[in-house]
C-alpha cells in the first residue's frame, strides 16, 4: 500500500470520485485515478465532507477495464494524455498470470507489480510486453 495526496477532484458522481493524486515522497508520480466512496453520495456540484484536496489517502493502484491492443517490443511506459480522464495507455511486462482475465505486470506506474484486470480474455505469457489501455483505479485502504 502506498500513500497519496489528493491534489484536486476532477469530478464527483454519486459514490464515484475522479481525482488527481500524487505519490508521497515522489513529486514526479502524479496520476489521475478513479475510486469509490461507498459511504458518501454526492451530486455533481456538491463538495465532499469526507475528503478534500491536500488529504492523504492510502491504497493500491491498479488498471481495470483493460483492453490489450497487441504485444509490444518497446520499453515499459505509461501515459495519461486525455485531460481530466483516468484513461491510461501503457506498455507493461507480464510477471504473473492469475487467469484469462487477470495478470500482474511490471510497470513504471508504481514500483511493485500492478494488477491488471482485462475486459476480455487475454492471451499472453510471462515476460511478454503488451500495449494496453484501461482505467487507472485506486483501491482505498482505510
Predicted stretch roles:
Residues 26-50, 108-126, 131-134, 138:
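Beta-strand/loop nucleic-acid-binding surfaces
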Residues 60-62, 91-93, 106-108, 131-135:
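Residue-level recognition of well-ordered beta-strand positions that form the cores
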Residues 20-74:
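Acidic (E/D-rich), amphipathic helical modules within compact regulatory domains
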Residues 12-15, 51, 64-72, 96-102, ...:
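Single-stranded nucleic-acid-binding OB-fold domains
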Residues 77-80, 89-121, 125, 142:
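Netrin-like (NTR/C345C) domain of secreted extracellular proteins
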Residues 1-16, 77-100, 129-132:
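Structural detector for short beta-strands of small beta-barrel domains
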Residues 60-87, 134-142:
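OB-fold/S1-family single-stranded nucleic acid-binding modules
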Residues 19-24, 103-107:
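SH3/SH3-like beta-barrel fold
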Amino acid at each position: 500500500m502506498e500513500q497519496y495526496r489528493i491534489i484536486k477532484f476532477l469530478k464527483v458522481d454519486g459514490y464515484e470520485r475522479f481525482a488527481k493524486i500524487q505519490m508521497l515522497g515522489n513529486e514526479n508520480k502524479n496520476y489521475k485515478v478513479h475510486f469509490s466512496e461507498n459511504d458518501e453520495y454526492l451530486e455533481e456540484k456538491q463538495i465532499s465532507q469526507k475528503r478534500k484536496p491536500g488529504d492523504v489517502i492510502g491504497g493500491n493502484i491498479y488498471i481495470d477495464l483493460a483492453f490489450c491492443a497487441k504485444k509490444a517490443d518497446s520499453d515499459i511506459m505509461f501515459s495519461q494524455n486525455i485531460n481530466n480522464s483516468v484513461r491510461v495507455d501503457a506498455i507493461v511486462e507480464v510477471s504473473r498470470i492469475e487467469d484469462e482475465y487477470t495478470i500482474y505486470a511490471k510497470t513504471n506506474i508504481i514500483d511493485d507489480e500492478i494488477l491488471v484486470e482485462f475486459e476480455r480474455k487475454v492471451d499472453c505469457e510471462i515476460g511478454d510486453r503488451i500495449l494496453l489501455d484501461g482505467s487507472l483505479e485506486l483501491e482505498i485502504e482505510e
